[in-house]
């Protein structure tokens, strides 16, 4: 009914990457997103490398994409990057049927999620 919201423009010192339709529930994905939020990218990559969560591989790919976007598209220094935002959104939910005893049936819900990672260049000020 109203105006469509304009896409948020990123500042010059930020870059982002989005992974859509990840086959995991938003709740499980958010556990891994919280793991990297606010950390330097080198530390975040190391944490994801040794995480036991299955979805950590996909989160690592998305973070590497954000780092590459920062380096190639925005000319930012990789050593000064920090994960500013890592947030999760719901995508669609596939509904499946599972036959049960006595002629009954049950619904199986297979959720998908979206992941957005924003990295920011934070320069250390010389005193």
Curated annotation (Swiss-Prot):
Keywords: Ribonucleoprotein, Ribosomal protein, RNA-binding, rRNA-binding. The keyword RNA-binding applies. GO terms for molecular function: rRNA binding; structural constituent of ribosome. CDD domains: Ribosomal_L22. GO terms for cellular component: cytosolic large ribosomal subunit. PANTHER family: CHLOROPLAST 50S RIBOSOMAL PROTEIN L22-RELATED, LARGE RIBOSOMAL SUBUNIT PROTEIN UL22M. This is Large ribosomal subunit protein uL22. It comes from Methylobacterium nodulans (strain LMG 21967 / CNCM I-2342 / ORS 2060). The gene is rplV.
């Amino acid at each position: 009914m109203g105006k469509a919201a304009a896409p948020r423009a990123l500042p010059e010192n930020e870059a982002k990457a989005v992974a859509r339709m990840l086959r995991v529930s938003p709740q499980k994905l958010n556990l891994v997103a919280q793991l990297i939020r606010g950390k330097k990218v080198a530390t975040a990559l190391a944490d994801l490398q040794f995480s036991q969560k299955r979805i950590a591989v996909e989160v690592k790919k998305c973070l590497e994409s954000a780092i590459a976007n920062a380096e190639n598209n925005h000319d930012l220094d990789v050593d000064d990057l920090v994960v500013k935002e890592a947030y999760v959104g719901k995508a669609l939910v596939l509904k499946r049927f599972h036959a049960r005893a006595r002629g009954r049936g049950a619904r199986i819900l297979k959720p998908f999620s979206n992941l957005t990672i924003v990295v920011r260049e934070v320069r250390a000020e010389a005193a």
